[in-house]
Regions:
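Non-cytosolic coordination micro-motifs
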Residues: 18-51, 86-185
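Surface-exposed, low-hydrophobicity interaction/linker segments
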Residues: 47-63
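N-terminal signal peptide c-region/cleavage motif recognized by signal peptidases
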Residues: 13-15
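Mid-chain, structured segments of secreted extracytoplasmic proteins
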Residues: 60-102
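Positively charged n-region of N-terminal signal peptides that target proteins for export
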Residues: 1-4
Length: 185
């Protein structure tokens, strides 16, 4: 009877924990695929028609998490040419290490927080993506970031870099070759 209780508990709780497996999202899917899965999201286009970010709160994807962790954390899906290339969790305020510790536990990262350092960066390679954890202790807050970056879309990251380099920072318009030549002379 005791084994049935353990089995039943695992069966009931497994979907809740599985829902928080953000690393199971397939890279390369379109922004519309992600938007269709979300009840609420907002869209930001740093480079319209080329680079798009879909933002929501972490609680929407992982409702079973502790409220402070889930509500105070922004979940961003990054798309280049409408292909998912990065998933990012950002907790920009607070005085805890909830996201950093959640990332270590969820992704089975053994490296621990170095208390004496104001900033710590951990990077772990997986089969098709890299997991990056960042914590930065600032005077009034603790900034935390987890990024899952596709290693299958390096060509798109290169295109994004080239596109960003070709944009005039003052006008946010794309430079043409003639403007580049005039600036060099």
């Amino acid at each position: 009877m005791r084994y049935w209780l353990v089995f039943l508990t695992i069966l009931i709780t497994s979907p809740v924990f599985a829902a928080c497996k953000i690393d199971q999202q397939q890279f390369g899917v379109s922004s519309q695929t992600i938007k269709n899965k979300l009840e609420f999201s907002t869209t930001f286009e740093p480079i319209p028609g080329f680079h798009e970010e879909v933002l929501t709160i972490f609680e929407q994807v992982c409702p079973s998490l502790e409220k402070t962790l889930a509500r105070d954390t922004t979940l961003k899906y990054h798309f280049i040419q409408d292909q998912l290339v990065m998933i990012e969790l950002v907790k920009a305020d607070g005085n805890d290490l909830l996201i950093f510790e959640w990332g270590r536990e969820n992704f089975d990262i053994q490296e621990k927080r170095k208390i004496n350092e104001e900033q710590q960066f951990i990077q772990v390679e997986q089969s098709d993506h890299i997991i990056q954890l960042l914590v930065r202790v600032l005077p009034d807050t603790v900034f935390q970031n987890i990024a899952l970056v596709s290693t299958q879309h390096n060509d798109l990251f290169e295109l994004l870099y080239e596109k960003e380099e070709s944009i005039d920072e003052d006008t946010l318009e794309e430079l043409d070759d003639e403007d580049d030549i005039e600036e060099e002379n």
